[in-house]
Every structure is written in C-alpha cells, then in structure tokens.
C-alpha cells in the first residue's frame, strides 16, 4: 500500500514530524562480552524517534501537540498501540516498509549504555510526499513545527528544508520551525532557514569547520549561524556539561544538572520538548531554556 493521508480538522499548537520512528527496545545485563550468550532482563518497549519523544514530553506537560509519522508493518502497529496507551495525539502515514526497531542494552556493572540503531525502511516518493502534503493541508497551521530525528533510506536529504518551506507557505510565515537532525539533512534545513536548531557540539564543529575549544568560540559559532540567516535561535547541546542558548542579542549558559543517570536515551528530545512546550505558553526564551534543561534531566 502506498503512503496514505487522512485529513482531519485538527488544530494544534505543536506538530512534530518523525520520518524515521522506532520501537525502542531496552534491557540490561551484568556485563557485555563478545561471542557470549548474554542473559538479559525482560525487555521494555517504548515508542521512539525524535519527534515522537518530543510529543510525549509535551503531552505529559499538558501541552497541545500532535505527532505525525510514517508507519508500517507489525512493528508500526505496536508503536501506534503504545502511543494510544499514553494517549498521545498522533497521525500516521501508512507505508509499505516495516517500522524499525532500536535496541539499548545497559551494562549494569558499569552503567554504560550500548545502543544499536537500524536504518529504517526504504520509503518511496509517494510515501514521503504524503508527509509533506499532510503538513501543507492542515486546516490550521501549527504555531511550532518540530522536525526531529534521522531520515530513512529513500527520503531526500533536503526533506526537512522542503517541510519547512511547506509549513511557511501554508502559515504565511507564522509557523516557527524547529529542527533537530544531523549531517546533510541539517545542512539543507539551515540553508532554508529555521527558527530554532539544536545541534550538538560535534555537529556545530562540522557545520562551521572549526575545532571550537572554548565557550567563547561556541557562542561565536552559534552567532555565525544566526548572522547568516540560518537560524534565529541556537540551542547548543553540550551533553553532561549542559547547554548554551544563543540569539542575535543574548547568550545563556546552563551547567549540567547533577542527577543519578538511569538512562541518557531521549534526554535531548526531552530538552526540546520542555523548551517548545514552554515557548508555546510564553515567548520568554530564558524561562523556556530552564524548562528544557529541567526536562532533559528528568
């Protein structure tokens, strides 16, 4: 079956798009060793993928959010069921390929996480075009469009840029586009221009071609993206060292929050979810930054 689209009169403050969703499977074992048969704990299943994780956080915070994503096969059905159990509003574009799985194994003796990420299904042009069409045909454009996660095989690297252009055209420029992706997809999205981008330090180094060894250089590199019209806000993720929020006229630094780490998986998505939820309530960027940091540490 080719990608399908079912339009419903949905109004939402925040629309998330996840082109490569996943059924996240997590477990733990005492020690990870090659060639050995490892006895693991019972698996935990969660709906996954960048935008889906963002939507789950927004929903838990009481925000108005809709998650849109392509879905296929038995794995896709299970992912949908898990979202329904959480009562997260969502819309699926049905595709022929099987939704991927991602695996996380925690080594309980050391606290290390081992993550295994599959590429995702091959999507054909009518399927990914249906995703563009859904966003462009919404009766009321969202205030925020969050495009997060990787792109599966078959989807062009400029998809995020195309999606941003569709959203801007439909909303006459009022929708704020937020992008959290990497590689060529990130470059193309920034060339189109977005409201907010959340790169990691490694991604910012790749974007600027600089080593960026100090906070001053981090800030200057982020401001370079802003001055070139690629983004209005840069939320630089620094991992356990916190984050840096940069606009044309201010820079805010937050140190990492000291918490007992149960799992680092999804922390970046939680940061985005908390921040965009706060921005949907108020345009106070400093307050939104605080919410993002708190959500990422939770």
Feature-to-residue mapping (PLM):
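Conserved phosphate/ATP/ADP-binding segment of small-molecule kinases
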Residues: 157-251
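Hydrophobic anchor at the start of a short beta-strand
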Residues: 14, 64-66, 90, 177, ...
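Short beta-strand scaffold segments in enzyme catalytic cores
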Residues: 56, 103-105, 242-245
């Amino acid at each position: 079956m080719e990608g399908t689209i079912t339009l419903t009169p949905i109004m939402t403050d925040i629309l998330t798009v996840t082109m490569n969703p996943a059924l996240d499977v997590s477990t733990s074992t005492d020690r990870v060793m090659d060639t050995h048969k490892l006895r693991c704990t019972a698996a935990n299943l969660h709906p996954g993928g960048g935008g889906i994780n963002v939507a789950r956080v927004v929903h838990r915070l009481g925000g108005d959010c809709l998650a849109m994503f392509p879905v296929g096969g038995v794995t896709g059905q299970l992912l949908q069921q898990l979202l329904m159990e959480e009562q997260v509003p969502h819309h699926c574009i049905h595709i022929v390929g099987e939704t991927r799985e991602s695996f996380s194994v925690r080594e309980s003796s050391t606290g290390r996480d081992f993550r295994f990420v599959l590429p995702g299904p091959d999507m054909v042009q009518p399927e990914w075009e249906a995703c563009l069409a859904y966003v462009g045909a919404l009766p009321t454009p969202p205030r925020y469009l969050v495009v997060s996660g990787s792109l599966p095989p078959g989807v062009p690297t400029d998809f995020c840029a195309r999606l941003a252009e569709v959203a801007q055209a439909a909303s006459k420029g009022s929708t704020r586009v937020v992008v959290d992706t990497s590689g060529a997809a990130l470059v193309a999205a920034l060339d189109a221009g977005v409201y907010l981008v959340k790169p990691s330090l490694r991604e910012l180094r790749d974007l600027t071609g600089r080593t960026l060894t100090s906070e001053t250089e981090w800030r200057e590199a982020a401001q370079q993206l802003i001055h070139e019209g690629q983004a209005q806000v840069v939320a630089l993720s620094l991992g356990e060292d916190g984050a840096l929020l940069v606009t044309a006229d201010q820079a805010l630094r937050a140190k990492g929050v000291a918490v007992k780490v149960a799992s680092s998986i999804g922390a970046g998505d939680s940061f985005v979810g908390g921040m965009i939820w706060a921005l949907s309530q108020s345009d106070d960027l400093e307050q939104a930054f605080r919410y993002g940091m708190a959500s990422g540490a939770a």
